[in-house]
């Protein structure tokens, strides 16, 4: 046997920790991992001085194709992801138009992804009052899970799931072994607070932040946990913004509820004070919190109570992010390129978070949660998906690859630059260049 590619002098970030070893690849998979590989190779790459991370599996991305490619599409979105060390992502059922609520919409988006995506991808299906009768079909065609909003999504074509819809959707998901992801904010609470603020003529940044307090997240998390406990469904709480909500969900996990917890890099890197300074580029829901709440979130992460960190990349054209009325602006942050950067800077460099924990949060844990055993780790038999990172290199992020440049991470200083990203042993990104043609494949989950 000969290898297709041999990495020499690597520092591998494995589930057990950092390991100096060689890595051999055959047919897109890791074939050897040992201190010194003697097997001949068609190509040998000296990666001395670099860390080899498992490719990021971003479990929360909005690429909006078809229908809203002018917001973000597979081509530009996956370039940004690859430049940030990602080799796989899970695309949300909105904001493509129409959203992924049926088998037909799933198949349309899957076809476009296989034509255009640089990296591998899975597709979430929607869970709304409009498509309860379509969930069996979506499960059969291979959705990675079902996504529900417990508050208004911002798009009328993807309405919020009322309590019965969410409950029945969880029962269906349980039957198919699928995860249900929830945007957990109280619909009634946030709607009434928003109406009251606007009736009083309030329209500023702080007015918006105060219209979605932490308690609106806690109330929705509690309900989602109750429904998951009663149905036995697997629950994934997305973009959790507060330490209190993490603690509540983790308590449920300790009681036996099948729940995982995702937060996002913007909640870890920016605060509500930054929103007041930066403006529209940092509007999201749940909103960014005050510094004390952010520190509580970090404490929960450092305690091991958070399972995944996903970008929630959700850009929009500049005209949707320009208004004197902050309530009317599109809520979404461009962050596909920066998740690993944030975790290396704010987690590893500033707080001593071990590299293997970062790799678990960004790769291993989402791969395990969503039934993707070939992904998420550097191990013999796994797909040869990895990023080459100069861990000690400090830089300012000034080159971005997503469609719109209204990006809050521009100009931020980070430690740990991604030099290259490899998908199944082939480079897709190298030092500012994208190599080859789109080669992304559709990922379908194995039964949980």
UniProtKB/Swiss-Prot annotation:
Post-translational modification summary for this protein: Carboxylation allows a single lysine to coordinate two zinc ions.
Binding site for Zn(2+) 1: 60, 62, 147, 312
Keyword Zinc attributed: yes
Domain of life of the source: Bacteria
Cofactor binding annotation: Binds 2 Zn(2+) ions per subunit.
Residues the entry annotates as binding Zn(2+) 2: 147, 183, 239
Pathway(s) of this molecule: Nitrogen metabolism; (S)-allantoin degradation; allantoate from (S)-allantoin: step 1/1
EC numbers, comma separated: 3.5.2.5
Keywords, comma-separated and alphabetical: Hydrolase, Metal-binding, Purine metabolism, Zinc
CDD domains membership: L-HYD_ALN (cd01315)
Residue numbers of N6-carboxylysine PTMs: 147
InterPro entries (alphabetical): Allantoinase, Allantoinase_bact, Amidohydro-rel, DHOase/Allantoinase_Hydrolase, Metal-dep_hydrolase_composite, Metal_Hydrolase
Cofactors named for this entry: Zn(2+)
Annotated SUPFAM superfamilies: Composite domain of metallo-dependent hydrolases, Metallo-dependent hydrolases
GO biological process: allantoin catabolic process; purine nucleobase catabolic process
Keyword Kinase part of the UniProt annotation: no
NCBIfam families named in the record: allantoinase, PRK06189.1
Family of the protein in this entry: Belongs to the metallo-dependent hydrolases superfamily. Allantoinase family.
Assembly and oligomerization: Homotetramer.
Record function comment: Catalyzes the conversion of allantoin (5-ureidohydantoin) to allantoic acid by hydrolytic cleavage of the five-member hydantoin ring.
Protein name listed in UniProt: Allantoinase
